[in-house]
Design a protein with these regions (language model features):
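Ser/Thr-rich low-complexity repeats and stalk/linker segments
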Residues: 1-81
């Protein structure tokens, strides 16, 4: 399975960004249970929209799934709003 993605520091407004295995599908889960998916670029970077409802102390999680269907363990980031 791929390594867990890295989530850059998260705030209440800016897009949520990070790095993962290039070409892997990153699934970001917001505190309210909704998700966003994006494919990491050739340099491994990825970005999803900020939902706009994050508050200080919320936790955002992300997993990476490689083209073979193997999913990483979760990475977490605590919102610093």
């Amino acid at each position: 399975a791929p390594a867990a993605p890295v989530i850059d520091p998260v705030n209440g407004t800016d897009p949520i960004t990070g790095t993962a295995e290039p070409g892997s599908t990153v699934t970001v889960t917001y505190p309210d249970g909704t998700t966003a998916t994006v494919v990491a670029g050739t340099d491994g970077t990825w970005s999803v929209p900020n939902p706009g409802n994050l508050v200080d102390g919320d936790t955002v999680t992300a997993t990476a799934t490689d083209p073979a269907g193997n999913t990483s363990g979760p990475a977490t980031a605590v919102v610093d709003a």
